[in-house]
Amino acid sequence: YLRKWLLFQYTDKVVSWTLLAVYLGTNMLYYTFHEGNMSHIYNFCFASVLLYITQTWHTKPTLYKAILLGIMGGMLTLIRPINILMALVFLLYNVVDRRTATQKLNMLWQYKHHLLAAVVAAFIIGFPQLLYWKHVTGQWLFYSYTNERFFFTHPRLLEGFFSYRKGWLLYTPIM
């Protein structure tokens, strides 16, 4: 679906080389064949579908596409709760200035029933997880990364980029 989305903007040759570079120049190959139980590939897959459906909905809005957007958003949020921010991709798609922001708000208002359907679809996808958390922890929302935290006052940018342990640029040089 990433290919289909990229073909809206670029030639087939450019898209093919780009996808090859992403596949070989990032951790995608490793996570595809060696760590298939990790969430990364599923996250990439659902995000790619979300991008494609976002483009097609903006080209020709239909209720079916809106429901698919909700399903993709729900699945992305299940994979990683922070992925709920992917909704911003849909909401801000092609917004570049105040004029396009106003046009987008008008479009979203015109298709508010599509937005409602997307939210309901996402909720239906996510509700079993909420029930599970309620049953197991007694809370509707549960933060499962209890030992993880952010270090905003002491960022380790150089280590994050170049460390041999988890260096972003070391293991994904194409970036």
Language-model segments: which ranges?
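Transmembrane-helix signature of polytopic, membrane-embedded enzymes
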Residues: 2-26, 45, 60-68
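Structural signal for the C-terminal ends of transmembrane alpha-helices
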Residues: 7-10, 53-59, 92-102
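Membrane-interface alpha helices of multi-pass inner-membrane proteins
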Residues: 19, 65-80, 87-91, 123-124
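Aromatic- and kink-enriched transmembrane "portal" helix at the membrane-lumen/periplasm boundary
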Residues: 19-49, 53, 74, 78-83
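Alpha-helical membrane-protein architecture signal
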Residues: 30, 64-72, 153-161
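Specific aromatic-rich, kink-prone transmembrane helix
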Residues: 42-73, 89-90
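Membrane-interfacial entry segments at the cytosolic side of transmembrane helices
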Residues: 63-65, 103-120
